[in-house]
Amino acid sequence: MGQKVNPIGLRLGINRNWESRWFPTKANLVENIGEDYKIRAFLKRKLYYAGISQILVERTAKKLRVTVVAARPGIIIGKKGSDVDNLRKELQDLIGKDVNINIKEERKAGASAQLAAESVATQLEKRIAFRRAMKKVIQGAQKAGAKGIKVSVSGRLGGAEMARTEWYLEGRVPLHTLRAKIDYGFAEARTTYGNIGVKVWIFKGEVLHKGMQPEKTEESAPAKKPRRTRRGK
């Protein structure tokens, strides 16, 4: 099951929080979902080169707050915050409501699965070899402190006539372990041969509650002592 479903959705309420945080009623449920989709689609298209790793939408009775977590927040803020003001006005025109925008910096950009997937996609669009792009992202994640990373690319790799899937795995990525903190990202590279899908899973460690023991692996298991030979009578 862990191999098939989205690892973020599988862990909601366990070690992952929702990215849309509000309580709906029957009257505004569809409207709120549509607004969240428009906000995310607009920001990802408008601020693609700022390296957005996460967009949080929070609603209260009268307020709508959007938090953008980006690797390069200076691109969004601009000189003296002028770009943020323009962005706020564009969002207000889009959904017809007052919006507060907060910009946060992604301190560990190398350990963000979404940024890693977008990095591979950008390199593929620049005609860099897919194996080289995958290995570069893996090295960056390991330097950022990731305990494991898996990168998968699917499509007409290298211009081949038949589409295929290639993937690399470094370290551990336990998709079936619900207490494992796993980040997931997806991006598409639009090449002359067609679209290439990029998926990235990054394992950041286990979230242990009181009384829980970490999962033992083959590397961490203690070595068995050699048996003593019995002496003859």
Swiss-Prot record:
Sequence ranges assigned to domain KH type-2 in this UniProt record: 39-107
Region annotated Disordered, chain positions: 212-233
GO annotation, biological process: translation
Gene3D superfamilies reported for this sequence: 3.30.300.20, Ribosomal protein S3, C-terminal domain
Family note: Belongs to the universal ribosomal protein uS3 family.
Function: Binds the lower part of the 30S subunit head. Binds mRNA in the 70S ribosome, positioning it for translation.
Subunit structure: Part of the 30S ribosomal subunit. Forms a tight complex with proteins S10 and S14.
Protein name: Small ribosomal subunit protein uS3
